[in-house]
Structure formats: C-alpha cells, structure tokens
Amino acid sequence: MSNMDIDGINTGTIDKTPEEITSGTSGTTRPIIRPATLAPPSNKRTRNPSPERATTSSEADVGRKTQKKQTPTEIKKSVYNMVVKLGEFYNQMMVKAGLNDDMERNLIQNAHAVERILLAATDDKKTEFQRKKNARDVKEGKEEIDHNKTGGTFYKMVRDDKTIYFSPIRITFLKEEVKTMYKTTMGSDGFSGLNHIMIGHSQMNDVCFQRSKALKRVGLDPSLISTFAGSTLPRRSGATGVAIKGGGTLVAEAIRFIGRAMADRGLLRDIKAKTAYEKILLNLKNKCSAPQQKALVDQVIGSRNPGIADIEDLTLLARSMVVVRPSVASKVVLPISIYAKIPQLGFNVEEYSMVGYEAMALYNMATPVSILRMGDDAKDKSQLFFMSCFGAAYEDLRVLSALTGIEFKPRSALKCKGFHVPAKEQVEGMGAALMSIKLQFWAPMTRSGGNEVGGDGGSGQISCSPVFAVERPIALSKQAVRRMLSMNIEGRDADVKGNLLKMMNDSMAKKTNGNAFIGKKMFQISDKNKTNPVEIPIKQTIPNFFFGRDTAEDYDDLDY
C-alpha cells in the first residue's frame, strides 16, 4: 500500500482498529482501510450486456445467476413484447415528426432515421466525448455545436395528380426527450431493443457494402469476406453482438489490437487494454468449432509480447474458418416500421421468434417501401432488402432462390445502391417502390457453420456462411483455399499450425460430395407446424456467391 494520506490518516502504518478510525470527532464517516488481501476479487470475465458501456456490478451479476431460467415460450413472449414496444416507439416518433401518412410510415428510410436517432440519443459515452471535443474546438475559435440534440433526414410524401413522390426534410430532437420516450415505452432501459436495431444495421451494411479496405488494412485477403459478418457492429452491442460477428471480424479486431501494442509497448500494461484484448481472444476461441483452431488461439493468448508471429497465426486461423466455419448466430431483423404494423396485420400470436416461423410470417405480411436512388432497379432493391432482413449476405444464393422462387443475382449484377441516401442525392420529388420479394417456403435459421461437408465454388468470395438450416452442399472454392494453404509453417508453433493445415487439407480431400444439415427440409409458408417437409431444389444455373466479383461501394467510402 502507498504512503498517501487519506483524510488525515496515514495509510502506511495503521495502529488503530477500523472502528476507531471510522469514529471521527468531526462526525463525518471516515473510510475503513482494509489490507489488500481482503479486497473482493475482480471478475475479469464479467460481460457487459449494456449498450451504455457501463461496467456490470457484482450485485447485478449475482442477481442474474439467481434468476430462474426462462422457458422457450417465456423467451418468445418477451421478444414479442420487445418488438411491439419498438413499433409503438416508432409511431410516437413519427407523430412528433408530423409524418402521419401510411406511405410515410412504411418508408424504410424513415424507419432507419428513427433508429439512428435512438442509437445516437442513448449513446451517453459518445455524447460526452463530443461535448468535450466541441469545448476544445470552441477554444480554438471553431463553431459551437449543441450535442444535446440529434436529428435525421426524413421523407415527406408529396402527391402530384396520380403520382406520389417523397421530399427530404431534416428534423432534430432533444436526446433527453428521445431517451425518456424510449424508456417509458419499453418500460425499462430497453437494451435488448437497442441491440436488435444495431444488428439490423450491421446486417444491412454486410449486404449493401463490401469491406475490402477493412480486410486489406489488417492483412487479410478480401476473399475471406464470408467470415466478416458484423464488422460494422459497435462495441456497445455486448454479448449479443459477439454472437452475430463472424470469425474474421474478431480476428481483425485482435490484429488491430496487436498492431497498436507493437507501436506502443506500454499498451498491454494497462489493465483495461489487456482485459479488452483477452476478451477478444476468448470470444474468438469460443467461436472456433475445431480443437486445432482453439489450440492456435491458445497459442496467441499465451504470447507475452504479441507481434508479427501472432498476426501470422491469426491470419491462418481466419483462412481455416473458410473451410471449418465458426458458429455465427443468424436473426431476422426487420425495420421498426414493420413492427409498428403488428397490431394492424392481425398478427395475433403473442409469441415471436427471431429465428423461426413468426419472423418470416411477419416479413411476408409487411408492405415496406424504399426510396429509389438514381439508377436503382426496384426488383434488385427488393433482393437487397430481403438479404438485409435475414442477414443473408454470405448465404448460398441457390438456397435463397429456392425459398423465394426468385432467381437471386450476385452483388455485381444488381442495379441498385444501398438504402442510405447521401446528402448530395437528396432532392425534391424522389420516387419509391414496394419491396416485393416474399418467401414461398421457410426454414429455421442456424448458428452452426454446417461443417459436415464442402463443395466446389467460384472466385472472389470463396465460401458461404449458412443462415438457413436446410440440407444442401456447402459452396467452397477449393482452388482458392489450396492457394491459401501454401504458406510457411516454421517457427515457435509449427506443430499447432501444422495440425490446423492438416485438418484443412483432410477436410478438403474428403468433403467433395455430400450435403450439410442432413435431413433438414424447408416448409411452405402456410405450414407453421412443419407437417409437410419439402426437399430444397438447388438450381445449378444460379451462382453460389453474392460477392463473387464485386462492384459494390466500400463501407469506408460512405458519405454520411
């Protein structure tokens, strides 16, 4: 203990009892100084489910452990309650914005505006950072910005004879008002609702944009795109966000951390930074589905001074995840404008599953409308919307085509841009279209990588990350994977690397034929109880990979 003086008490030598110390003559309560060994142990592995980024208290931890585990029915009821409340919040925000027409409320861009405003209003840490930064800027003579407000671009409907157009309007809200309205509607802090929205935005980004720059920056090949799910998820999405992230996303986070540690050798001496780094690696280890992959992560965890060798190990791990896929959770996330329609759609079951029939039935009932940007094709835009809702950016296009009865195209063949309209494109009288692609069949969603089997693939994107649990061959470009396998495995952990490469080679050799998700079938959308399973037809004329040869704009080039 250091010899610093606390309230007149020298902490170097204490010759009084704690009671004598605390009974001061001034009547004020003084601290009890306890030996360091009596301090409660810190729980390094405490997860933070809160999007406010606050640390979880040990009392809350104990409370969670003693809670009775929810039954599947109870979970479905609480999820139903959450999505209905999100819809109520959307309706309140639209009333406040003065947008009351059904067409305005069905507009995906208006839903996204409300969602972004809510996320900005509830991000206290970012608001505090902006305030401090702005205070410094004002001292340097820059303009003062009111960070107590947040806003977004909404679209108001304009009727011209028989034609309907939309015109952009900028509306601002007080952050505190938005927060209060949200918490009152949800009946709690509503962290699960915020996480749900963040996942929806992440899935939309995965579909609309490529992440070549982000992959190249950490030395990963752009062909590993199928492992990069959830790469735009904010850290405050907590454990829910980690479940959605692909293995490559976590590898990239770890490599970035190692890069910072190499530039600043004191970084990992900071307990907060070290804990954050260890947490990323533990999450990565939990993602891995093969013991050889877990052994490689253990090798990196055991490294005292992370450096180039660890980056090489993690790069190999990311490559192996193309062949032996990690567990990535899949969820159906719809714009909150659709949840607002639940009472009107006759959706009378008070249970809702984000991975099962209810979410898919709700998607089919909805009538979402999107602004069309210059050169957008309405059918192609519908495909983007479908894939965004189902998080199907890296799913096999043949599976999606079988479920919808529509031939899905790769990203490079789609004549449409993302759903966010940049400021320079916002003009008076913008057209819109109904998102028309619907499910003819449904199948439960999966969190498994479908590792039973592999198959042949193409170029560009070289593997799939399954979303729907239906029996099919897993598309994989063996030629591209074999190119990646020709690497140097010498060094401190040659055995671990060698084992992993052997596993990949064995996997490639034996998995030429056969299917993954054996016995899993699809069902007609009217068949809620799975009474008549249907074999999935795989059309060989449709390409496997959405990002085969991609021409999408990069997420990093976005002009928000």
From Swiss-Prot:
Q: How does it assemble?
A: Homomultimerizes to form the nucleocapsid. May bind host exportin-1/XPO1. Binds to viral genomic RNA. Protein-RNA contacts are mediated by a combination of electrostatic interactions between positively charged residues and the phosphate backbone and planar interactions between aromatic side chains and bases.
Q: Which InterPro entries match?
A: Flu_NP
Q: Which GO terms describe its molecular function?
A: RNA binding; structural molecule activity
Top-rank lineage group of the source organism: Viruses
Record key words, sorted:
Capsid protein, Helical capsid protein, Host nucleus, Host-virus interaction, Ribonucleoprotein, RNA-binding, Viral nucleoprotein, Viral penetration into host nucleus, Virion, Virus entry into host cell
Q: Which GO terms describe its cellular component?
A: helical viral capsid; host cell; host cell nucleus; ribonucleoprotein complex; viral nucleocapsid
Q: Which family does it belong to?
A: Belongs to the influenza viruses nucleoprotein family.
Q: Where is the composition biased (Polar residues)?
A: 10-29
Q: Give the UniProt subcellular location, in the record's own words.
A: Virion; Host nucleus
Cited function: Encapsidates the negative strand viral RNA, protecting it from nucleases. The encapsidated genomic RNA is termed the ribonucleoprotein (RNP) and serves as template for transcription and replication. The RNP needs to be localized in the host nucleus to start an infectious cycle, but is too large to diffuse through the nuclear pore complex. NP comprises at least 2 nuclear localization signals that are responsible for the active RNP import into the nucleus through cellular importin alpha/beta pathway.
On modification after translation, the UniProt record reads: Late in virus-infected cells, may be cleaved from a 56-kDa protein to a 53-kDa protein by a cellular caspase. This cleavage might be a marker for the onset of apoptosis in infected cells or have a specific function in virus host interaction.
Q: Where is this region: Disordered?
A: 1-73
What is the name listed in the Swiss-Prot or TrEMBL entry for this protein?
Nucleoprotein
Q: Which Pfam families match?
A: Flu_NP
Gene label: NP
Ribonucleoprotein among keywords: yes
Q: Name one GO biological process term.
A: viral penetration into host nucleus
Its primary localisation, in coarse terms, equals: virion
